[in-house]
Protein backbone atom coordinates (compact mmCIF):
# COMPACT_ATOMS: atom_id res chain seq x y z
CA UNK A 1 0.00 0.00 0.00
CA UNK A 2 1.38 3.36 -1.02
CA UNK A 3 1.37 6.19 1.47
CA UNK A 4 0.87 9.82 0.59
CA UNK A 5 2.97 12.36 2.48
CA UNK A 6 1.00 15.45 1.46
CA UNK A 7 0.96 17.91 4.36
CA UNK A 8 -2.45 19.11 5.54
CA UNK A 9 -1.28 21.23 8.48
CA UNK A 10 -2.59 24.48 7.01
CA UNK A 11 -5.93 22.92 6.08
CA UNK A 12 -6.52 21.55 9.58
CA UNK A 13 -6.08 24.68 11.67
CA UNK A 14 -8.83 24.66 14.34
CA UNK A 15 -9.90 28.24 13.65
CA UNK A 16 -11.00 27.17 10.17
CA UNK A 17 -13.61 24.84 11.61
CA UNK A 18 -14.72 26.19 14.97
CA UNK A 19 -14.85 29.57 16.69
CA UNK A 20 -13.56 29.48 20.25
CA UNK A 21 -14.94 32.12 22.59
CA UNK A 22 -13.22 33.40 25.72
CA UNK A 23 -15.74 31.42 27.78
CA UNK A 24 -14.61 28.17 26.14
CA UNK A 25 -11.01 28.95 27.05
CA UNK A 26 -11.85 29.57 30.72
CA UNK A 27 -14.33 26.76 31.30
CA UNK A 28 -13.24 23.84 33.47
CA UNK A 29 -11.89 20.82 31.61
CA UNK A 30 -15.14 18.90 31.99
CA UNK A 31 -17.02 21.36 29.83
CA UNK A 32 -14.44 22.65 27.38
CA UNK A 33 -12.95 21.24 24.21
CA UNK A 34 -9.86 19.58 25.56
CA UNK A 35 -7.76 18.65 22.55
CA UNK A 36 -7.33 19.33 18.87
CA UNK A 37 -5.86 16.38 17.06
CA UNK A 38 -4.86 15.94 13.43
CA UNK A 39 -5.19 12.29 12.49
CA UNK A 40 -4.43 10.98 8.99
CA UNK A 41 -5.09 7.72 7.25
CA UNK A 42 -4.32 6.47 3.76
CA UNK A 43 -6.10 4.37 1.21
CA UNK A 44 -5.10 3.26 -2.28
CA UNK A 45 -7.85 2.47 -4.75
CA UNK A 46 -7.27 -0.63 -6.85
CA UNK A 47 -8.75 -0.77 -10.35
CA UNK A 48 -9.62 -4.38 -9.76
CA UNK A 49 -12.36 -3.22 -7.41
CA UNK A 50 -14.21 -0.40 -9.13
CA UNK A 51 -16.49 0.20 -6.16
CA UNK A 52 -15.23 -0.37 -2.65
CA UNK A 53 -15.93 0.51 0.97
CA UNK A 54 -12.63 0.59 2.87
CA UNK A 55 -12.52 0.94 6.70
CA UNK A 56 -10.66 4.07 7.81
CA UNK A 57 -9.07 4.68 11.23
CA UNK A 58 -9.84 8.38 11.67
CA UNK A 59 -8.91 8.40 15.36
CA UNK A 60 -5.56 6.66 15.25
CA UNK A 61 -3.52 7.85 18.23
CA UNK A 62 -6.47 9.54 19.98
CA UNK A 63 -6.84 8.60 23.65
CA UNK A 64 -10.56 8.09 24.20
CA UNK A 65 -10.28 6.49 27.65
CA UNK A 66 -10.46 9.81 29.53
CA UNK A 67 -13.33 11.43 27.66
CA UNK A 68 -16.91 10.57 26.84
CA UNK A 69 -17.28 12.20 23.43
CA UNK A 70 -15.27 12.99 20.33
CA UNK A 71 -16.38 15.58 17.78
CA UNK A 72 -15.39 15.54 14.12
CA UNK A 73 -14.57 19.19 13.53
CA UNK A 74 -13.05 19.00 10.08
CA UNK A 75 -12.11 16.52 7.38
CA UNK A 76 -9.64 17.05 4.54
CA UNK A 77 -9.52 14.49 1.73
CA UNK A 78 -6.49 14.80 -0.55
CA UNK A 79 -5.63 12.72 -3.57
CA UNK A 80 -3.24 12.21 -6.47
CA UNK A 81 -4.02 10.42 -9.73
CA UNK A 82 -1.33 7.90 -10.69
CA UNK A 83 -2.23 7.86 -14.40
CA UNK A 84 -1.20 9.87 -17.50
CA UNK A 85 -2.74 13.31 -17.93
CA UNK A 86 -4.69 12.15 -20.96
CA UNK A 87 -6.62 9.61 -18.87
CA UNK A 88 -10.39 9.96 -18.96
CA UNK A 89 -12.95 9.21 -16.28
CA UNK A 90 -12.80 9.95 -12.59
CA UNK A 91 -13.87 8.83 -9.15
CA UNK A 92 -16.62 9.50 -6.63
CA UNK A 93 -15.28 9.61 -3.08
CA UNK A 94 -17.30 9.66 0.13
CA UNK A 95 -16.62 9.33 3.85
CA UNK A 96 -19.35 7.19 5.42
CA UNK A 97 -20.47 6.64 9.00
CA UNK A 98 -21.22 2.91 8.88
CA UNK A 99 -23.33 2.97 12.05
CA UNK A 100 -26.25 4.02 9.88
CA UNK A 101 -28.29 1.40 8.00
CA UNK A 102 -28.50 3.62 4.93
CA UNK A 103 -25.29 4.68 3.18
CA UNK A 104 -27.04 7.86 2.06
CA UNK A 105 -27.82 8.87 5.65
CA UNK A 106 -24.36 7.87 6.84
CA UNK A 107 -22.52 9.91 4.21
CA UNK A 108 -20.48 12.62 5.93
CA UNK A 109 -18.96 14.13 2.81
CA UNK A 110 -19.00 13.30 -0.89
CA UNK A 111 -17.33 14.72 -3.99
CA UNK A 112 -16.21 13.82 -7.51
CA UNK A 113 -12.60 13.98 -8.72
CA UNK A 114 -11.94 13.82 -12.49
CA UNK A 115 -8.71 12.16 -13.58
CA UNK A 116 -7.74 15.31 -15.46
CA UNK A 117 -7.27 17.06 -12.10
CA UNK A 118 -3.89 15.65 -11.18
CA UNK A 119 -3.89 16.56 -7.49
CA UNK A 120 -6.78 17.74 -5.35
CA UNK A 121 -7.72 18.55 -1.77
CA UNK A 122 -11.27 18.94 -0.44
CA UNK A 123 -12.25 20.27 2.97
CA UNK A 124 -15.49 19.49 4.83
CA UNK A 125 -16.96 20.46 8.19
CA UNK A 126 -18.99 17.54 9.64
CA UNK A 127 -19.06 19.03 13.16
CA UNK A 128 -20.98 16.26 14.89
CA UNK A 129 -20.20 14.35 18.10
CA UNK A 130 -19.78 10.60 18.57
CA UNK A 131 -19.84 8.73 21.87
CA UNK A 132 -16.33 7.52 22.68
CA UNK A 133 -17.53 3.92 23.02
CA UNK A 134 -18.81 4.07 19.43
CA UNK A 135 -15.69 5.82 18.16
CA UNK A 136 -13.50 3.03 19.57
CA UNK A 137 -15.19 0.68 17.11
CA UNK A 138 -13.95 2.75 14.13
CA UNK A 139 -17.35 3.19 12.45
CA UNK A 140 -16.03 5.17 9.46
CA UNK A 141 -15.26 3.90 5.97
CA UNK A 142 -14.10 5.41 2.70
CA UNK A 143 -16.37 4.74 -0.27
CA UNK A 144 -14.75 4.98 -3.71
CA UNK A 145 -16.36 4.39 -7.10
CA UNK A 146 -14.23 4.54 -10.25
CA UNK A 147 -15.92 5.56 -13.48
CA UNK A 148 -14.50 5.12 -17.00
CA UNK A 149 -10.89 4.99 -15.81
CA UNK A 150 -9.10 2.95 -18.49
CA UNK A 151 -6.57 1.08 -16.37
CA UNK A 152 -6.06 -2.68 -16.19
CA UNK A 153 -7.07 -4.70 -13.16
CA UNK A 154 -4.55 -4.96 -10.36
CA UNK A 155 -3.02 -1.50 -10.79
CA UNK A 156 -3.41 1.56 -8.57
CA UNK A 157 -4.84 4.62 -10.36
CA UNK A 158 -5.49 6.79 -7.30
CA UNK A 159 -3.90 7.50 -3.91
CA UNK A 160 -6.07 9.10 -1.23
CA UNK A 161 -5.30 10.66 2.13
CA UNK A 162 -7.92 11.37 4.78
CA UNK A 163 -7.07 13.82 7.56
CA UNK A 164 -9.42 14.55 10.43
CA UNK A 165 -9.45 17.28 13.06
CA UNK A 166 -11.20 16.14 16.23
CA UNK A 167 -11.93 17.44 19.72
CA UNK A 168 -12.44 15.30 22.82
CA UNK A 169 -14.62 16.39 25.72
CA UNK A 170 -16.81 15.10 28.52
CA UNK A 171 -19.80 17.32 27.84
CA UNK A 172 -21.56 18.17 24.56
CA UNK A 173 -24.84 19.61 25.84
CA UNK A 174 -24.55 23.38 25.55
CA UNK A 175 -28.15 24.34 26.35
CA UNK A 176 -28.54 22.34 29.55
CA UNK A 177 -28.52 23.49 33.16
CA UNK A 178 -24.89 22.48 33.75
CA UNK A 179 -23.60 24.69 30.96
CA UNK A 180 -25.82 27.56 32.10
CA UNK A 181 -24.52 27.40 35.67
CA UNK A 182 -20.88 27.08 34.65
CA UNK A 183 -21.17 30.06 32.33
CA UNK A 184 -22.46 32.12 35.28
CA UNK A 185 -19.46 31.14 37.37
CA UNK A 186 -16.94 31.86 34.63
CA UNK A 187 -18.52 35.19 33.77
CA UNK A 188 -18.10 36.46 37.34
CA UNK A 189 -14.92 37.90 38.81
CA UNK A 190 -16.09 37.10 42.35
CA UNK A 191 -16.43 33.86 44.24
CA UNK A 192 -19.83 32.28 43.64
CA UNK A 193 -21.88 30.67 46.36
CA UNK A 194 -24.60 28.17 45.55
CA UNK A 195 -27.45 30.47 46.61
CA UNK A 196 -26.45 33.07 44.06
CA UNK A 197 -26.93 30.53 41.27
CA UNK A 198 -30.68 30.42 41.85
CA UNK A 199 -31.02 33.31 39.43
CA UNK A 200 -29.78 30.96 36.73
CA UNK A 201 -31.23 27.67 37.94
CA UNK A 202 -34.84 28.65 38.52
CA UNK A 203 -35.38 30.53 35.24
CA UNK A 204 -33.84 27.59 33.40
CA UNK A 205 -36.58 25.22 34.55
CA UNK A 206 -39.25 27.85 33.98
CA UNK A 207 -38.42 28.36 30.32
CA UNK A 208 -38.24 24.67 29.38
CA UNK A 209 -41.53 23.98 27.52
CA UNK A 210 -43.83 21.17 28.62
CA UNK A 211 -45.94 19.56 25.93
CA UNK A 212 -49.71 19.22 26.04
CA UNK A 213 -49.35 15.43 26.12
CA UNK A 214 -47.46 15.59 29.41
CA UNK A 215 -49.98 18.02 30.86
CA UNK A 216 -52.81 15.67 29.94
CA UNK A 217 -51.19 12.70 31.67
CA UNK A 218 -50.23 14.56 34.82
CA UNK A 219 -51.95 17.88 35.71
CA UNK A 220 -49.24 18.57 38.31
CA UNK A 221 -46.94 19.66 35.49
CA UNK A 222 -47.24 23.44 35.32
CA UNK A 223 -44.80 26.14 34.32
CA UNK A 224 -44.02 28.83 36.82
CA UNK A 225 -45.85 31.38 34.71
CA UNK A 226 -49.07 29.55 35.58
CA UNK A 227 -48.25 29.50 39.29
CA UNK A 228 -47.31 33.17 39.55
CA UNK A 229 -50.14 35.45 40.58
CA UNK A 230 -48.25 38.58 39.65
CA UNK A 231 -44.74 39.83 39.15
CA UNK A 232 -42.62 38.57 42.00
CA UNK A 233 -45.60 36.79 43.64
CA UNK A 234 -46.44 33.13 43.93
CA UNK A 235 -49.44 31.17 45.04
CA UNK A 236 -49.18 29.97 48.60
CA UNK A 237 -49.23 26.36 47.38
CA UNK A 238 -47.65 26.13 43.99
CA UNK A 239 -48.30 22.84 42.21
CA UNK A 240 -45.60 20.22 42.45
CA UNK A 241 -43.19 20.04 39.57
CA UNK A 242 -41.35 16.91 38.65
CA UNK A 243 -37.94 17.80 37.37
CA UNK A 244 -36.85 14.32 36.38
CA UNK A 245 -38.87 14.24 33.17
CA UNK A 246 -37.37 15.33 29.88
CA UNK A 247 -39.35 17.81 27.83
CA UNK A 248 -41.12 16.31 24.83
CA UNK A 249 -41.22 19.61 23.02
CA UNK A 250 -37.94 21.01 21.78
CA UNK A 251 -36.90 23.83 19.55
CA UNK A 252 -36.75 23.04 15.87
CA UNK A 253 -33.42 21.85 14.59
CA UNK A 254 -32.46 22.26 10.95
CA UNK A 255 -30.13 19.85 9.23
CA UNK A 256 -28.08 21.09 6.29
CA UNK A 257 -27.06 18.55 3.69
CA UNK A 258 -24.68 20.96 1.99
CA UNK A 259 -21.28 20.57 3.61
CA UNK A 260 -18.69 23.29 3.19
CA UNK A 261 -15.81 22.34 0.95
CA UNK A 262 -12.74 24.01 -0.46
CA UNK A 263 -11.14 22.72 -3.66
CA UNK A 264 -7.50 23.32 -4.38
Swiss-Prot record:
Which terms in the GO cellular component ontology are assigned? host cell cytoplasm; host cell plasmodesma; host cytoskeleton
Gene Ontology terms describing biological process = transport of virus in host, cell to cell
Pfam families assigned to the protein according to its UniProt record, in alphabetical order: MP
Main location per the UniProt record: host cell
One MF term in the entry's GO annotations: RNA binding
Where in or outside the cell it occurs: the entry states: Host cytoplasm, Host cytoskeleton; Host cell junction, Host plasmodesma
Compositional bias (Basic residues) at which positions? Answer: 231-240
Residue ranges for the region (Disordered) are 219-264
Q: In which domain of life is the source organism classified?
A: Viruses
Which key words are in the record?
Answer: Host cell junction, Host cytoplasm, Host cytoskeleton, RNA-binding, Transport, Viral movement protein
Recorded family membership: Belongs to the tobamovirus movement protein family.
Q: What is the documented function of this protein?
A: Transports viral genome to neighboring plant cells directly through plasmosdesmata, without any budding. The movement protein allows efficient cell to cell propagation, by bypassing the host cell wall barrier. Forms a ribonucleoprotein complex with viral RNA. Binds microtubules and modulates microtubule stability. Can bind double-stranded DNA.
Q: What is this protein called?
A: Movement protein
Question: Which organism encodes this protein?
Answer: Cucumber green mottle mosaic virus (strain watermelon SH)
Amino acid sequence: MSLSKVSVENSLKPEKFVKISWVDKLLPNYFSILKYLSITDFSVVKAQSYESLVPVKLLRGVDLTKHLYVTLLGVVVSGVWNVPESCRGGATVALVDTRMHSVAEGTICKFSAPATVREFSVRFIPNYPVVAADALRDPWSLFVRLSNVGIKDGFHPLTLEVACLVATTNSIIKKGLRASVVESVVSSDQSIVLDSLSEKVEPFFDKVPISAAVMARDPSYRSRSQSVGGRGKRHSKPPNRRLDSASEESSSVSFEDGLQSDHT
